[in-house]
């Protein structure tokens, strides 16, 4: 059972589940309450949609494991045993079962809430995950960018579901949301998507550093293999500084809206400080195991981003009360 949970990537699945629920409860619902006494999408439908995204993430983890094992056997010129072949076949079947279940749930929501675009995005996301594992994961720098984009897209999914449904029901619910209001909530989602993109890129590149020697033996052309450790650290430093700068800008925008010093302090402490700690240790690190520890540490920054959503929701909660 433990092996199956690991194969499904239960940690990333849990992050998707909690993240999407928090984006809805802390940002979307308070935003709607400024203009309507309800939301367009019922909670049960949103829950089905969220579990569909969780299944897509699980299928993504399974297909990545399948192709990693397959590639390792090919490079090592190793003939798999019957037990290993059966395990690989089971992984491939599991991917398609999870993918079909995920798209069935997305299709249910699309039919019930007249938001067919959601099913289209789900199909594109599933195909993106499949081709990432099949091809882009092992390509120079492209793999790091593709995986970061896939994770960033997830951030927009809760809002896109509401937008598509609202557009289709606009004749029943006349549009009363000012353009400024729409821009403000979309700006928050853009910020969080940018945060997720950058932290995923940094984390994936850190993992490439940790697997440097192993990738050399497998003839995989990752960024550290081609450009070296020094160039990789320079790139990581630049992206990390960009991440911190984005956080500072986000906090500044936050302060202008709600003028609460304690929330500003918490936001800086919650995101900028962990990245400064990462930068200090990155430039001191030389051993492979230390890179692995940094990779694991960056997983905690995702949790920091989830906590930040709680404070971002205060923008709309306070405005709703006013």
Spans of features found by a protein language model:
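Multi-pass alpha-helical membrane architecture of UbiA-family
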Residues: 1-322
């Amino acid at each position: 059972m433990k092996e199956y949970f690991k194969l499904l990537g239960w940690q990333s699945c849990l992050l998707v589940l909690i993240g999407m629920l928090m984006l809805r409860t802390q940002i979307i619902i308070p935003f709607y309450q400024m203009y309507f006494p309800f939301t367009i999408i019922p909670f049960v439908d949103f829950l089905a949609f969220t579990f569909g995204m969780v299944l897509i993430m699980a299928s993504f983890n399974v297909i990545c494991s399948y192709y990693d094992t397959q590639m390792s056997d090919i490079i090592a010129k190793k003939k798999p045993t019957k037990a290993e072949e059966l395990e690989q076949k089971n992984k491939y079947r599991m991917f398609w079962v999870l993918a079909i279940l995920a798209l069935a749930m997305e299709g249910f929501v699309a039919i019930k809430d007249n938001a067919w675009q959601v099913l289209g995005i789900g199909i594109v996301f599933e195909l993106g995950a499949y081709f990432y594992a099949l091809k882009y994961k092992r390509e120079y720098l492209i793999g790091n960018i593709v995986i970061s984009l896939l994770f960033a897209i997830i951030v927009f999914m809760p809002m896109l579901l509401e937008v598509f449904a609202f557009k289709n029901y606009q004749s029943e619910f006349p549009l009363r949301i000012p353009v400024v209001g729409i821009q403000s909530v979309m700006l928050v989602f853009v910020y969080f998507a940018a945060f997720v993109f950058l932290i995923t890129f940094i984390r994936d590149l850190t993992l490439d550093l940790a697997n440097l020697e192993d990738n050399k033996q497998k003839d995989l052309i990752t960024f550290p293999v081609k450009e070296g450790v020094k160039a990789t650290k320079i790139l990581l430093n630049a992206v990390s500084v960009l991440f911190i700068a984005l956080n500072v800008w986000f906090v500044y925008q936050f302060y202008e809206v709600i003028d609460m010093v304690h929330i500003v302090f918490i936001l800086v402490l919650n995101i900028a400080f962990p990245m400064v700690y990462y930068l200090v240790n990155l430039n001191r690190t030389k051993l492979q195991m230390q890179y692995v520890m940094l990779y694991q540490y960056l997983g905690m920054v995702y949790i920091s981003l989830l906590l930040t959503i709680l404070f971002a929701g205060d923008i709309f909660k306070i405005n709703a009360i006013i």
